[in-house]
Amino acid sequence: MSTDARQPADYQTIADLDEGARRVAVLEAALELDVFTTIGAGTLSLQEAALAIGADPRALAVLLDALCALGLLDKSSAGYELGTAAAAFLARGSESFGGDVVLRMSAARRRLADVVRSGRAVGDLAALSGGDFWAEFASHRLVTWAEEVEEEFATWRELGVTADRCPGARILDVACGSGTRSFGLAREDPEVRIVALDSAPVLEIAKKLAARMGISERIAFRAGDVTSTDLGSSEFDVVLLSYLLYFFTPEDAHGLLDRVWRALKPGGLVVVRAAIADEKRQAEVDALLNAVDLLLWLPSSRVYTLNEYQDLLGGAGFGEIMRRGEEIITAVRPS
């Protein structure tokens, strides 16, 4: 393309990226200094906060005021106190604390250039999978679950998985996380039974959510590794794979989908949720930034395009493969 045919250069894209980086820097600094935990449930004056944190008062004031502007702190004549989001998600001791996830991901992202040069991951994904990282990653839904469950249930209605059309469904939620994506089905239909599969630490979050929703007796919690756990044979009407397949190479994804096919009853439905890359890999921002995050931990990972998902599902024996939304693909095990 000639220079004359191009759009005029717009610096706003660069400015917007820099603005995002400034906000992240403020959040990182506050987490590293343990600002939110130090302030806790009370109100601290600047001098009290500086003494407790071990910081220069003037410099700390600049940081705390910026946190107020970002809505994470509130400021009064008495001093600083936590905003509702900071109290829920950024203060240690909260059951929905997620600050360590933010710090760990930020530290990994700062090493992106090293990963690109070497092709080697910044850390061991297996260590993340077996530890508390994903439990903390899911924990914010202990606060936000009500709205999310309603949104997810609306999606299930669009897919035709409801009490009147699929009564008493047997559902397998693979890598279930907090459970918000499937648990609404059990609340709507008392006869629904869900097998929630994930690591033991993550299942503790899912158990808390099920208890709050009053559906614990309808959920079977199964601790296991999604790469190797036996999923059963012809047991389920629906299998849900949420934001999972892009952790797998095509060969490993095919292996998982083979097990999913066997786990489904004939005529059963697999629902794949994923950030789907456009075919040219140049336009879908969420999908392509997800690919960057995955690269940090698992260089062999792949954010797939729609055509690639169709090939994976078709190769595993599924039919009626359809894109049903921005991040949803469904397919059926033939009867």
Which residues does each PLM region occupy?
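A short glycine-rich, Lys/Arg-flanked "PGG" loop and its adjoining helix->strand segment in the class I
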Residues: H254-P266
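Conserved SAM-binding strand-loop segment of SAM-dependent methyltransferases
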Residues: I215-V226
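Conserved Class I S-adenosyl-L-methionine-dependent methyltransferase catalytic core
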Residues: L17-A21, A29-A30, A61, D65-G168
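A short acidic, Gly/Pro-enriched loop at the edge of an enzyme's catalytic core
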Residues: T227-V239
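Conserved class I S-adenosyl-L-methionine
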Residues: C166-G177
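Core SAM-dependent methyltransferase catalytic element
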Residues: A316-S335
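Conserved SAM-binding loop of SAM-dependent methyltransferases across substrates and taxa
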Residues: S178-D189
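C-terminal alpha-helical "lid/dimerization" subdomain adjacent to the S-adenosyl-L-methionine
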Residues: R273-G315, E320-I321
